Amino acid sequence: MKHVLKNDWGPLLAPEFEKEYYRELDVFLKEEYSIHVVYPKVEEIFNALEYTSYENTKVVILGQDPYHGPNQAHGLSFSVQPGVKTPPSLLNMYKELRDEYGYDIPNNGYLVKWAEQGVLLLNTVLTVRQGEANSHKGKGWEHFTDRVIELLNEREKPVIFILWGRHAQAKKKLITNSNHHIIESVHPSPLSARRGFFGSKPYSKVNTILANMGEREIDWEIPNL
């Protein structure tokens, strides 16, 4: 499962692929993919990093592990492939976006448009066994994605980290550089969205920060497919 990242993440993350934890993760993944149905497809595991280069990252939206249903996960946190029903948390994200900007809720959950504008849609665990949430937790991915966060933390150019829920907020300890910005609330899940996600205005907060930095704002509107 070693991967040659074709953009500037390549040299930055190359040392990780040689570390003992990743070698063990690699053995585990080869076995998992050969015996079980695992998401996303092997070639899509690193999609978040492929779509959003290190230099171009403006925003990080941190997720947990991939969706574990058929045809959902494709390597971007919260995003699903075209033609698949929009999951409940993403639907709540769209509702908040509608309330902030008046955008119609789209007929899909395909967030590539965000990724292409510099929104790194990163899960902390990059693979999952079909139908078994968190089945690849604690196998090594957390070391790898912590390193991604640490590398962004080392950057002088500010990054806006969106941390929804306790799992994402646990990564705050990795964000020590005062150049960066943190936007946090409860998770958009139906279990918690009404306890402070709705009305938190994360999207306009991001764009206010970007505008103040002289950066191009994110066009958050997802088109119908």
From Swiss-Prot:
EC annotation from Swiss-Prot or TrEMBL: 3.2.2.27
Signal peptide: none
Keyword Cytoplasm: yes
Catalytic activity entry: Hydrolyzes single-stranded DNA or mismatched double-stranded DNA and polynucleotides, releasing free uracil
Locations listed in the record: Cytoplasm
Gene3D superfamilies associated with the record: Uracil-DNA glycosylase-like domain (3.40.470.10)
Entry keyword set: Cytoplasm, DNA damage, DNA repair, Hydrolase
Principal location: cytoplasm
An example molecular function term from Gene Ontology annotations: uracil DNA N-glycosylase activity
Chain segments annotated as coiled-coil in the UniProt record: none
Domain of life: Bacteria
BP GO terms, sorted: base-excision repair, AP site formation via deaminated base removal
Catalytic residues, chain numbering: D65
CC terms in the record's Gene Ontology section: cytoplasm
First-tier enzyme category under EC: hydrolase
Primary role: Excises uracil residues from the DNA which can arise as a result of misincorporation of dUMP residues by DNA polymerase or due to deamination of cytosine.
Family: Belongs to the uracil-DNA glycosylase (UDG) superfamily. UNG family.
UniProt protein name: Uracil-DNA glycosylase
Originating organism: Bacillus cereus (strain AH820)
Top-level taxonomy: Bacteria, Bacillati, Bacillota, Bacilli, Bacillales
